[in-house]
């Protein structure tokens, strides 16, 4: 009689699918948190609560656009998504790193606009 361990069936290479799914969730969460930080900065700029030098603002916009592209590519049916974990990990790591770097630069350069009464 055949005994089947269902956990061993769902593997990619030598890595269990659960490990890949967990890594996927963590990377998506980190990328989304970095994007939320950028969104908060954009909200302050739009509300007129703060200002940024043009160069820093352009870098932040570029990093955010890369986030949107990566999100729309990997988190929808446009790509092979979950079936390309190496490509996903590489892309999301770069996008998250760039967002964090530009968020930190923007936070450092953020100038509060005086409140008009």
Question: Model-flagged regions — what are they?
Answer:
Residues 1-113:
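Primarily the internal scaffold of c-type cytochrome electron-transfer domains
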């Amino acid at each position: 009689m055949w005994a089947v361990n269902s956990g061993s069936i769902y593997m990619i290479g030598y890595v269990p699918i659960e490990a890949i799914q967990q890594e996927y969730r963590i990377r998506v969460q980190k990328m989304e948190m970095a994007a939320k930080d950028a969104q908060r900065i954009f909200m302050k700029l739009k509300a007129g609560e703060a200002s940024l030098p043009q160069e820093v603002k352009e870098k932040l916009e570029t990093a955010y656009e890369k986030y949107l592209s990566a999100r729309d590519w990997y988190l929808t049916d446009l790509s092979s998504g979950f079936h390309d974990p190496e490509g996903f990990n590489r892309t999301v790591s770069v996008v998250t790193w760039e967002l964090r770097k530009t968020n930190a630069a923007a936070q450092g350069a953020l100038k509060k606009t005086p409140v008009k009464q």
